[in-house]
């Protein structure tokens, strides 16, 4: 049997692997050692350069593309044309959780009331000076009983309110004419009679004051008697006797809101005429009894107001 080849022998490397080169002999001088070190550094730099050039493998490219795609998606999510400023949200915030000793006791009348408790109570716009929802339902059913179609009841009431804006909403007025709708008509006296049975004409007119206000401006038709009532042309749209309820929160508002908003001059003109009208109508209120022994068969004296104390000084 032939002997085995010694390690490092050429015959033992028949597999084709490259034999490991023998280590260089030790440097004899310091200068030779520095030269060898510099050569080793150059070889290391060349190997790193080759590795960097060959690093863009398909797997590395796929990772880079995935990272770029994720970055682009992130930038798109952060991109927006809306920027909210002055952020302050009170509605929808998480409810506070006070400790047990500070929680409200609903059985104790003197328990402190929190802001969250008050927020749960939704406001209701209520006025005792205009017709209530129950009054309006009674009026609707009564008008239906007279033959007014259900879908025309609102139109009949609004038409009557618009007529009252031109005349008066007083219970003592004598309504004239008819109230028409598509396919029928009803005498105005019957409508007023039904309203006064369940409420008052003025309360119903106050309920629709904002509707009448918008209608007059939309059609550019102020109340007919504005000039006879002494109103200036600049405030002529305020010349109806339920103008003071246009901005009342309990009144029925048009879907587009109140347009235009009543001015301060219109309120001054209206309240001035209201004072004069009430003084003229209440002259008999000075009598404690209407017996002829007291009144002497005469109307009461005119009521006069001293307006000399009004602040008419210029600033």
Swiss-Prot record:
One of its GO terms (cellular component) is ribonucleoprotein complex. Residues 1-60 are annotated as: Disordered. GO terms for molecular function: structural molecule activity. Its main location: virion. Coiled coil: none annotated. The keyword Zinc does not apply. Keywords: Capsid protein, Helical capsid protein, Ribonucleoprotein, Virion. It is found in: Virion. Required for genome encapsidation. Forms ribonucleoprotein complexes along with TGB1 helicase and viral RNA. This is Capsid protein.
